[in-house]
């Protein structure tokens, strides 16, 4: 029997689901328990294929627009995704007489309120974010067309010409890189000294915490694996942060079977984290895949303990959600005990 080579896996904490993602998934599951299938969900509830497929198996039906819901099912509940939606979406739901449950992350809702506050004070709103991201579409859709300008890059910030440079306020997409945001803000604040910040930090606590955990584990890592989907903004940022802070290579994977072990080369230290929409059960799966090939020692790299939780919608608070209901995403193994 061959002897397995030793391997240290640095397991980042915090990692994976944030309170907003956890709440959104719970809302879909609770709606299924209370109202029965099907429950419609506008857009992916979170950007993770495994989560979406798991909810589909339990009776959720995902649509991109409300008019995709058949008329005979318009008495069934519809859930809005964690990313938030433009104001036009609940207005359309009201026109269709749909019963909807809003799973928008409370921190995204806070950004919406900050944008509206800027407008009430007569300011044009600058949104720092990525075009086409559902959260950006939702935030821009809180105000009338033309009231928000999207700034994606430092180049955008350098060339932006407002109508009134003394009447500007900004908000940011919650899942942006802290460093990327800082560079854009530095340009904007130098060009427009009167630029008004939001009353509270727009970048989500979980985004910052996961980036800090990756920074702490990156140096000395032969490989840094980030569990997440290609369309997950916060997961892609973690890959960038890992490389920027010293990992020899950093890879985004959705499942263990995407890892090409034959091409990884010699490994002594592998660091492992997960984006805010990536389930813990995939972290378990990846560790198991490494255990089949290496003599693995787990080292927990913890930077902060997260205690945040968000209440689900009032209509669902009388429904009991069991650990078994969430087992398809949370997993059952030893890594779960290491996650805060």
From Swiss-Prot:
InterPro entries: LytB/IspH
Annotated positions binding (2E)-4-hydroxy-3-methylbut-2-enyl diphosphate: 47, 83, 133, 174, 232-234, 277
Tree of life domain: Bacteria
Cofactor binding mode and count: Binds 1 [4Fe-4S] cluster per subunit.
Entry binding sites for [4Fe-4S] cluster: 18, 105, 204
GO terms, biological process: dimethylallyl diphosphate biosynthetic process; isopentenyl diphosphate biosynthetic process, methylerythritol 4-phosphate pathway; terpenoid biosynthetic process
Cofactor(s) named in the record: [4Fe-4S] cluster
Keyword field contains Metal-binding: yes
Major enzyme class: oxidoreductase
Residues at the active site: 135
Gene Ontology molecular-function annotations: 4 iron, 4 sulfur cluster binding; 4-hydroxy-3-methylbut-2-enyl diphosphate reductase activity; metal ion binding
Positions of dimethylallyl diphosphate binding: 47, 83, 133, 232-234, 277
Annotated binding of isopentenyl diphosphate, by residue: 47, 83, 133, 232-234, 277
Entry EC number(s): 1.17.7.4
Protein's pathway: Isoprenoid biosynthesis; dimethylallyl diphosphate biosynthesis; dimethylallyl diphosphate from (2E)-4-hydroxy-3-methylbutenyl diphosphate: step 1/1; Isoprenoid biosynthesis; isopentenyl diphosphate biosynthesis via DXP pathway; isopentenyl diphosphate from 1-deoxy-D-xylulose 5-phosphate: step 6/6
Keywords: 4Fe-4S, Iron, Iron-sulfur, Isoprene biosynthesis, Metal-binding, Oxidoreductase
Catalytically driven reaction(s): isopentenyl diphosphate + 2 oxidized [2Fe-2S]-[ferredoxin] + H2O = (2E)-4-hydroxy-3-methylbut-2-enyl diphosphate + 2 reduced [2Fe-2S]-[ferredoxin] + 2 H(+); dimethylallyl diphosphate + 2 oxidized [2Fe-2S]-[ferredoxin] + H2O = (2E)-4-hydroxy-3-methylbut-2-enyl diphosphate + 2 reduced [2Fe-2S]-[ferredoxin] + 2 H(+)
Job of this protein: Catalyzes the conversion of 1-hydroxy-2-methyl-2-(E)-butenyl 4-diphosphate (HMBPP) into a mixture of isopentenyl diphosphate (IPP) and dimethylallyl diphosphate (DMAPP). Acts in the terminal step of the DOXP/MEP pathway for isoprenoid precursor biosynthesis.
Family recorded in the similarity comment: Belongs to the IspH family.
NCBIfam families the UniProt entry points to: ispH_lytB, PRK01045.1-4
Protein name: 4-hydroxy-3-methylbut-2-enyl diphosphate reductase
């Amino acid at each position: 029997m061959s002897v397995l080579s030793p391997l240290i896996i640095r397991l980042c904490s915090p990692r994976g689901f944030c309170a907003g993602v956890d709440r959104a998934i719970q809302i879909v599951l609770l709606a299924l328990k209370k109202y029965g299938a099907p429950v419609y969900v506008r857009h992916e509830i979170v950007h993770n294929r495994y989560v979406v497929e798991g909810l589909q198996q339990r009776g959720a039906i995902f649509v991109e627009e409300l008019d995709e819901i058949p008329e005979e099912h318009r008495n069934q509940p519809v859930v809005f995704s964690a990313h938030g939606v433009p104001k036009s979406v609940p207005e359309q739901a009201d026109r269709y007489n749909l019963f909807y449950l809003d799973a928008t992350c409370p921190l995204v809702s806070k950004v919406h309120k900050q944008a509206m506050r800027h407008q009430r004070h007569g300011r044009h709103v600058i949104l720092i974010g990525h075009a086409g991201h559902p959260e950006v579409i939702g935030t821009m859709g809180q105000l009338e067309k033309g009231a928000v300008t999207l700034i994606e890059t430092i180049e955008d910030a350098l060339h932006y010409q407002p109508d009134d440079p003394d009447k500007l306020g900004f908000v940011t997409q919650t899942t942006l890189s802290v460093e990327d945001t800082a560079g854009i803000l530095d340009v904007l604040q130098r060009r427009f000294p009167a630029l008004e910040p939001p009353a509270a930090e727009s970048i989500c606590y979980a985004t910052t915490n996961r980036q800090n955990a990756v920074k702490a584990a990156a140096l000395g890592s032969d490989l840094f694996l980030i569990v997440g989907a290609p369309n997950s903004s916060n997961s892609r940022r973690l890959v960038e942060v890992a490389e920027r802070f010293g990992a020899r290579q950093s890879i985004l994977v959705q499942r263990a079977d995407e890892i090409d072990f034959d091409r990884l080369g010699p490994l002594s230290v592998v660091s492992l984290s997960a984006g805010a929409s990536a389930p813990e059960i995939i972290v378990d799966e990846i560790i198991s895949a490494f255990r089949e090939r290496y003599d693995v020692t787990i080292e927990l790299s913890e930077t902060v303990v997260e205690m945040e939780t968000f209440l689900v919608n009032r209509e669902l608070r009388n429904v009991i959600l069991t650990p078994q209901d969430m087992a398809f995403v949370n997993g059952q193994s030893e890594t779960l005990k290491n996650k805060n």
